[in-house]
UniProtKB/Swiss-Prot annotation:
The chain crosses the membrane at residues 44-64, 111-131, 143-160, 161-178, 277-297, 310-330, 381-401, 415-435, 450-470, 484-504, 521-543, 552-572. It is a multi-pass membrane protein. Belongs to the ATG22 family. It is found in: Vacuole membrane. It holds the Pfam family ATG22. It comes from Penicillium rubens (strain ATCC 28089 / DSM 1075 / NRRL 1951 / Wisconsin 54-1255). This is Autophagy-related protein 22-2. GO terms for cellular component: vacuolar membrane. Residues 9-31, 203-263, 585-607 are annotated as: Disordered. One of its GO terms (biological process) is amino acid transmembrane export from vacuole. Glycans are attached at N88, N91, N235.
Length: 607
């Protein structure tokens, strides 16, 4: 492992400056992808995934809710929610819900956190779409990655200064952090096609055994110092989507003009790099989460916790921000700029440059709309996107609600919530590897596997609703009445989420017209981000009306089950045939294929 860390401080190899293929545009960097670059790409995943898991998934919603709670009052008695004069009862119905004034309105403190994250996701979606074309030009790709990375890290670090009277500013920092997180990941993924395209193995041919080897694998060789060992999971993510006795070509519509997606050397290499990056990011997140729990346990015994219950969590967010910024700096040193074509060949200075940027923003939205018009003619794709719209909203709603429910209803301590996050994260990693095996063993169709995941996901809100049954409520256990009950549900949530994330994306890929992957994945990502703000906002409104988060489980139970009939209706074979026919139509309308043309993928296509 030390050999990999030391790469950050080594000088680039002289061979890295040698152009290996003719450039497609003036200024294109076609030098071979080096081990340093791959490590730089991994490094940012290690940096930002920590904020995604430890910040967004754990301590940010808790900190925001607690900051508001320390400024809030009980709605009925008007006693402070926190302090010596606060009510001793933990039952919110006895003294009324804890509310805080925000812009003249009284909002439940848990709803305040949910509204904030809902707004953050909405702004993130608008940002992703607007910047989708800009990053493909000049040095914008690396510039945007650094801007988003350092700005997000700074937003996390600044939480250490956010005292309860400044809780509204804390919500602004959440919006900035979440927006930078999502945007930076998409920019990072936009590097992947460039790194793969310039990999020496794809330019020089195949290895002696006929298999593709990336430059990173060449550097590793058979050395015993390889910290990740041999990679036996190089198959594309489409593997396991079909029963073992069903040929992959059955989804190709019999065209036979192109190799199956999973046999593409570029896609195999891209999948290998991506899967390793995700794994390293999750490992880093678990590592920092463990450190965070130790910090919380230590700081809770000091005078800091007596000043404000948020201080230990704010110091954890400081640590998370420092980690994010430090590894972003490593990425800055290792990752090449890899510039795109010039933004404006006529005028690149002054107002002309700004006009060019605005045109690209407009182009991004226009491209998205053009894709929507094409999708409207593809019935199977349209049905699946509607299902994905509902499903992604349900996943975001359950994730955001669970943390606040654990804190406000189950009274879980902050370290235990950190442990809850670790449980869900490790379960998600397990689920990503488990579901392909389950699918092969039971010979499940892709849609059946997705439906099975959704059915298991439905267990979470249904289990929480058991507490409304009188005799179960009298037992005082089951139906999420005891803190320990949420941990088995966290395992279910993690395993199901890991399967849904990978299977839905791969299944959608089977329906895409060949040659339009970038545009359709842009719409897929926009559908994800564009829907994920609705559910949390609705649950926030329900909590405001009822004073209890548990009442939001009714809405979540309905939201989760809605995609099932839609997924069942999708015919993958028919969708693939429609996609191939549409690809032929689009090819004719654009004057035939243009294999040598530059692919304008856009940011959203790589998420």
């Amino acid at each position: 492992m030390l050999s990999y860390i030391s790469a950050a401080f080594q000088s680039p190899s002289p061979d890295e400056g040698v152009q290996q293929r003719p450039p497609r545009y003036v200024g294109e960097d076609t030098t071979p992808t080096s081990r340093r670059e791959i490590l730089g790409w991994y490094s940012y995943g290690i940096a930002a995934e920590v904020f995604a898991v430890c910040g967004v998934g754990s301590f940010l919603p808790l900190t925001l809710e607690q900051l508001a709670r320390e400024r809030g009052t009980l709605q009925t008695s008007r006693l402070p929610c926190v302090g010596p004069s606060a009510g001793n009862s933990t039952n919110a119905t006895e003294h009324g819900q804890c509310v805080v004034p925000v812009f003249g309105l009284e909002i439940n403190t848990a709803s305040f956190a949910m509204y904030t994250f809902s707004l953050a996701v909405l702004i993130q979606a608008l940002t992703l779409i607007s910047f989708s074309a800009l990053a493909d030009y000049e040095n914008n790709r690396k510039t945007l990655l650094m801007v988003f990375g350092f700005a997000g890290a700074l937003a996390s670090m600044l939480f250490v200064f956010i005292a309860p009277p400044l809780f509204v500013i804390g919500s602004i920092l959440v919006v900035v952090g979440v927006t930078c997180l999502g945007s930076s990941f998409v920019v990072l993924n936009s590097y992947l096609p460039v790194l793969v395209a310039n990999d020496p193995s794809l330019q020089e041919g195949k290895a002696d055994d006929g298999t593709e080897m990336s430059s990173f694998d060449r550097d590793e060789g058979d050395s015993e110092g390889n910290p990740w060992g041999k990679d036996h999971t190089d198959n594309d993510s489409l593997d396991g989507l079909q029963p073992s006795d069903q040929p992959q070509s059955s989804l190709e519509g019999g065209m036979g003009t192109k190799a199956p997606l999973s046999s593409s050397p570029e896609l195999q290499l891209s999948t290998k790099i991506s899967s390793r990056g995700i794994g390293l990011g999750y490992c880093a997140a678990v590592f920092v989460q463990i450190i965070s729990i130790i910090m919380l346990l230590t700081l809770s015994k000091t005078k800091l916790a007596k000043v404000s219950a948020t201080l230990p969590m704010r110091f954890v967010l400081l640590l998370v921000g420092i980690w994010w910024g430090a590894f972003t700096l490593v990425t800055r040193n290792l990752l090449k700029t890899r510039p795109g074509p010039r933004l404006d060949t006529v005028s690149t200075k002054g107002t002309g440059r700004w006009r060019a940027w605005l045109r690209l923003v407009g182009f991004a939205w226009k491209s998205l709309w053009e894709t929507v018009k094409v999708v409207s003619k593809l019935r199977e794709v349209l049905i699946f996107l509607v299902a994905w719209f509902l499903l992604s909203d349900a996943m975001a709603t359950v994730s955001g609600t669970a943390i606040l429910f654990a804190r406000t209803e189950l009274k879980l301590s902050t370290p235990l919530i950190g442990l809850l996050s670790i449980t869900a994260t490790l379960s998600g990693m397990t689920g990503a590897f488990l579901w392909p095996q389950v699918s092969r063993y039971f010979r499940l169709q892709p849609s059946h596997t997705i439906i099975l995941c959704i059915a298991l996901f439905e267990m979470i809100p249904l289990y929480g609703l058991l507490a409304y049954i009188p005799f179960i409520k009298n037992w005082g256990v089951f139906g999420l009445q005891q803190p320990w009950e949420i941990f088995p549900l966290a395992i279910v949530h993690g395993v199901v989420s890991g399967g849904l994330a990978s299977y839905c994306r791969s299944f959608f890929g089977l329906l895409i017209p060949p040659g339009s992957e970038a545009a359709f994945y842009a719409l897929y990502a926009a559908t994800d981000k564009g829907s994920s703000f609705i559910g949390p906002a609705i649950v926030g409104g329900i909590v405001d009306a009822t004073g209890q988060i548990r009442s939001g489980f009714f809405f979540m139970a309905i939201l989760i089950v809605l995609p099932i009939p839609l997924v069942w209706m999708v015919n993958a074979d028919k969708g693939r045939r429609e996609g191939l026919a549409m690809a032929e139509t689009l090819g004719k309308s654009h004057g035939g294929p243009a294999e040598d043309a530059q692919e304008a993928e856009g940011l959203l296509a790589r998420e």
